[in-house]
Amino acid sequence: MRDSLGPFRTFTLLTVGLLLSLCVIKTVKHRRRYHRLPTPPHSMLLGNLGVVLAEILASPEGFFHLFCVENIRRKYNMPSVFYLDLWPILPSIMVVAEPAVAKHMTQVQPLQRERFSPNLFSPLLTAEFILAMEQKNWKKENPALNAALTSTRVNEATSLLAPSLHSLRSRLHSISQSGKQYPIKDLLISYIIEVGGVIQLGGSFDLLAETSALDPIIKRSLDMMGWNPVKRYIYSKEIKQRTDCLNKVLVETIQNTAQTGESGKMSQSPIYLAHYCYLFLHKHPDCLREMREEHDRVFSPDRTQTWELLQKEPHRINSLHFTLAVVKETLRLIGVGGAFICHLAMGRRADLFPDPDAFRPHRFLPGANPSIPADSFRPFEKGHLSCPGQNLALKSLVLLLLTTSREFDLVPVFPKGAPQAAEYLGGKGYPEFHIGPHVNKGMPVMVHTRVDA
């Protein structure tokens, strides 16, 4: 009896064989492109996927994936520009930790900017969100955003922040009196968004009030962002059920803004940076002491006089050079940026920043010797695609430290036996994946009110 499936079987085998041959040819052709390029150990079968996967598996739970790139650079002693062949799972990338190359890519002959997928931020934010915006629209919107977020504009609006800063102090006092551990991430998120709302919209969302109705909605929204489909589904249903509350507050704020003549757009600030400022200052009490002395000197040892001066002479914030240096040094050590221009790797190069793993804010003081090499410190990027919210981000963090550092001690209390990364990445306070790298577990702290405050 003749096999009626014989021709079909033959055709199937030939088709499969042809497809496999094409895959092999394409793989070999692609891998050969990296044969003479600087890469970590590279195989014809997996490219650099094996190296990256091994690094991810060796990292603690929830580790922020971009920091694996710096670990790979160190482990294999890679040059300041190297390649990661991640095809076909991910796009292959060129990792840049060289200031001159970064300048060329962003200022001399600007390349297409990295664009975040709007799906990462939905349903809270749409494709019009600034990180998901097309380059042509970014170019159109960026000048207006920069004009609304100048250092002068931020200084002028500082006096409006007094009620919010008082609410922040009250919350910290309540946490201190409770004697309980508290994930400081929650309060810092509220603070950053509150400051952005006051400075850019001229109105408060009352996020720092203990009875805020809007605060838990925003927290849920931020927790929802990411790639976990189950968490996104669960939280998205909850968010959609309560958007009427959020929309009402925003509409009222925008209407009030229109009536008072204020304008601006909410920008994304590096919330993660506040966590690490506290973490590094706790680990370096000498820097904390020097920063407190600067606050006494520039403003007043008396808290009441400090508040009065802050409202009457907000330009004094510009004289907090060491406090700003603390913020910048934290940005250098925990810089994020993209996978192409790797700010973290650039900030950890010993030839650019002597003793690169040490927390040394003095390197950013005016007149510091050696000075910061040109184009090597670029946490907000440069050129026409730079972050428009950098003045707001820096000033809001300086204000945060001025408001809290002399009155409170925030002591991290990570669980005993908690996983940890390399010490140069924070140890138990390693960067955990979120929109940005937040301190692991939301940085649980004990808040102590200082006796001499």
Curated annotation (Swiss-Prot):
Cofactors that this protein relies on: heme
UniProt cross-references to SUPFAM superfamilies, sorted A to Z: Cytochrome P450 (SSF48264)
Compartments it resides in: Membrane
UniProt topology in membrane: Multi-pass membrane protein
Keyword Lipid biosynthesis: no
UniProt key word Transmembrane: yes
Cleaved signal peptide residues: none
Residues where heme binds: C387
GO cellular component: membrane
PANTHER family per UniProt: CYTOCHROME P450, P450, PUTATIVE (EUROFUNG)-RELATED
Biological role stated in the UniProt entry: Cytochrome P450 monooxygenase; part of the gene cluster that mediates the biosynthesis of the indole diterpenes penitrems. The geranylgeranyl diphosphate (GGPP) synthase penG catalyzes the first step in penitrem biosynthesis via conversion of farnesyl pyrophosphate and isopentyl pyrophosphate into geranylgeranyl pyrophosphate (GGPP). Condensation of indole-3-glycerol phosphate with GGPP by the prenyl transferase penC then forms 3-geranylgeranylindole (3-GGI).
Family to which this protein belongs: Belongs to the cytochrome P450 family.
UniProt-recorded name of the protein: Cytochrome P450 monooxygenase PC-20
Organism field: Penicillium crustosum
